[in-house]
Amino acid sequence: EMCIRDSAYASHGDTKHILLFPEDPQECFEFSAEAFNLAERLQTPVFVISDLDIGMNDWVTDKFEWDDEKKYDRGKVLNAEDLDKMDNFGRYLDIDDDGICYRTYPGTHPEKGAFFTRGTSHDEYARYTENGDINEQTLTRLVKKFRTASELVPNPIIDLSDKQGSCLLYTSPSPRDSDT
């Protein structure tokens, strides 16, 4: 489906986005909350891709339970004390080598942590550049981030049969309930 590709590469084509595919209304509920958590931690859009069956048909489900004790992972956020310890704040510095950079909230520090940037044409310090080597470093970092994301998203349901073929099928309702 076009919406899957468009969601996965929604930008200039130089980044990927996280896609979650719920199998039923319960997972829609759970994945919607998890999408916000992942978006904060990974600093990238996360799309919950629901199909027509889930969205248009009536379903009998258990009552959705919200966990008021759930704590969200806001990701790598520097506070004023962290910034005071740094010589320079680099918005796109990959200090931990996982593709995810540290960020700040507006107003965190009177002198450090603010930045202005545009697109992917920037260096580690959010300064504009069209240098090809720096752009390659940025894209390499984004690939690392996507690999890190693969360790954080819900595990896929993979059903391999003895049949040979070359067809990938995405569908619902639940693949766990399918006889095929």
Predicted regions: what they are:
Residues E1, D177-T180:
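N-terminal low-complexity segments that are often proline-rich with Ser/Thr-Pro
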Residues C3-I4, T171:
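Residue positions that mark polypeptide boundaries
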Residues R5-D14:
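Flexible glycine/proline-rich, aromatic-decorated loop/lid segments
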Residues Y9, F21-D24, E34, S50-L52:
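Fold-independent oxyanion-binding glycine-rich loops
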Residues D14-F21:
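Short beta-alpha connecting loops at secondary-structure transitions
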Residues D24-P25, S172:
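Short beta->alpha junction loops/turns
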Residues F31-S172, R176-S178:
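Flexible, low-complexity linker and terminal segments
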